[in-house]
């Protein structure tokens, strides 16, 4: 369009997106003053999406992709021989109870109409023995939400579940909960504009696509300027 329209009234800034996968490059660029430096008034991003028909676009106003947080939990018990569990505080048992109980947050604590994912993705100990109960177990996981209030609530519940179960079973637990990418939030006006452009190109644009629980550091840019992610 810009090549064909030489009298384009405005400035188009093409943004290279470094460190998107976990590095939070978008956050660093915003903090470095990118929006002010280049006079950016609206911001748009585009991503491929396996699963939708080839040659079509999809977008929605509001929450497009989830906020992504991370947590590390260290459960500490009392190690010992597996043949004498009564002389130990079994950190593996405590960690297993925590993993199961964390799933009650989504199923029993959060409104069923509010999207939330709590996934424990790593369970590790310092031992690879068949007959030694380890002193400690480490859990690592992620939380995905589409609503800031739900995000706050889930963080509080995770901390309560982890410390409560550990204490009830005679162990201790430390939790490091870190906020990551915010919700990718499409503004109403720019979303409609992006959809219209998509229709001109492809003839169709699905504006009823469901939000996705993946995360995107383009969200940091949308927190600074109105825009849309398609």
Report each predicted region and the residues it spans.
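Histidine/acidic-residue-rich, glycine-tolerant segments that coordinate divalent metal ions
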Residues: 2-134, 215-216
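Metal-dependent amide/peptide-bond hydrolase catalytic core
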Residues: 93-230
């Amino acid at each position: 369009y810009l090549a064909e329209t030489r009298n384009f009234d405005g400035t188009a800034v093409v943004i290279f997106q470094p460190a998107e996968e976990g590095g939070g490059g978008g956050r660093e660029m915003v903090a470095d003053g990118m929006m002010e430096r280049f006079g950016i008034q609206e911001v748009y991003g585009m991503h491929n999406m396996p699963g939708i028909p080839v040659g079509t676009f999809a977008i929605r106003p509001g929450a497009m992709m989830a906020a992504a947080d991370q947590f590390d939990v260290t459960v500490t018990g009392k190690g010992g021989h597996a043949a004498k569990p009564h002389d130990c505080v079994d950190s593996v048992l405590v960690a297993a109870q925590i993993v199961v109980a964390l799933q009650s947050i989504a199923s029993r604590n959060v409104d069923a109409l509010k999207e939330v994912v709590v996934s424990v993705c790593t369970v590790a100990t310092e031992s690879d023995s068949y007959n030694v109960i380890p002193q400690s177990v480490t859990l690592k996981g992620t939380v995905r939400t589409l609503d800031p209030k739900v995000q706050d609530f889930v963080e509080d519940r995770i901390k309560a579940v982890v410390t409560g179960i550990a204490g009830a079973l005679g162990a201790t637990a430390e939790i490091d909960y870190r906020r990551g990418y915010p919700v990718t939030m499409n503004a109403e006006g720019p979303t409609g504009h992006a959809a219209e452009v998509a229709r001109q190109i492809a003839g169709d644009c699905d504006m009823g696509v469901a939000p996705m629980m993946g995360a995107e550091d383009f969200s940091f840019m949308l927190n600074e300027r109105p825009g849309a992610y398609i």
